């Protein structure tokens, strides 16, 4: 099954569906419009609508996470063997991107439901062109290897593919980006303030072996993400435990 946060009509998901027809019957269940930066949001305050576009494509009036829930419980004829979220036109690299990304969230939602899931994002070349066919060929080759072996329980793969030629593939950890978002302030016709949040141009910082830096060297990055977000080092921190014990006594 395929989903994304750009909409069922986006070039990346269409190219990927056509390519994966070689090894199966991939369904698209994706938003009916742009849903970037929605993370794991669910639509709870108004009903969702589903439109059948063709025999293997469904458009949902919701987020990527909504799409996964509806696909598994109401749309697909059977539980999918794999979920691919993407291909996103633009990177999803580093701790900040994956926290906001609807593309990554679609894959994480699949993992929550016990289905092996992968998020795929692509980077443009110097002219701004996305090489979706090249990226789809890589995903096709990868799935041939992954489907027989699945993924470890609770693990989602976050894959970012630079423009060709690529030097190879590296398993990486998440890096960090330093964002300086531009806040644009304007006034409406009634002189009320309103704002747009811009992303600005982020700068990669930190470990040279992290995804945000490795991809700049021309490598495909594959970053395993785990649904368990517990910080086990802090969990063992005796000072933190003592602090909360003192808080408990003062509170009671």
Which residues make up each language-model segment?
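Electrostatically charged, flexible surface regions
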Residues: 132-252
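Short beta-strand segments
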Residues: 3, 29-31, 61, 85-88, ...
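Hydrophobic/aromatic ligand-binding patch that stacks against planar heteroaromatic rings
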Residues: 106-110
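Glycine-rich phosphate/pyrophosphate-binding loops
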Residues: 111-134
């Amino acid at each position: 099954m395929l989903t994304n946060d750009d909409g069922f009509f986006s070039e990346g998901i269409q190219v990927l569906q056509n390519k994966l027809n070689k090894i199966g019957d991939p369904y698209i269940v994706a938003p009916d419009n742009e849903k970037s930066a929605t993370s794991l949001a669910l639509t709870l305050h108004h009903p969702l609508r589903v439109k059948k576009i063709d025999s293997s494509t469904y458009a949902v009036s919701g987020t990527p996470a909504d799409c996964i829930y509806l696909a598994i419980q109401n749309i697909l004829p059977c539980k999918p063997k794999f979920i691919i979220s993407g291909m996103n036109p633009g990177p999803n690299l580093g701790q900040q991107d994956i926290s906001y990304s609807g593309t990554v969230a679609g894959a994480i939602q699949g993992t929550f439901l016990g289905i092996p899931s992968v998020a795929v994002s692509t980077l443009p070349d110097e002219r701004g062109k996305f090489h979706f066919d090249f990226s789809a060929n890589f995903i096709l080759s990868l799935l041939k290897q992954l489907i027989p072996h699945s993924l470890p329980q609770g693990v989602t793969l976050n894959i970012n593919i630079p423009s060709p030629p690529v030097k190879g593939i590296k398993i990486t950890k998440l890096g960090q980006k330093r964002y300086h978002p531009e806040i644009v302030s304007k006034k409406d016709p009634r002189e009320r303030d309103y704002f747009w949040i811009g992303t600005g141009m982020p700068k990669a910082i930190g470990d040279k072996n992290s995804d945000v830096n490795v991809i700049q060297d021309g490598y495909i990055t594959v970053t395993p993400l785990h649904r368990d977000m517990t910080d086990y080092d802090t969990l063992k921190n005796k000072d933190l435990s003592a602090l909360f014990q003192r808080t408990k006594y003062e509170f009671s």
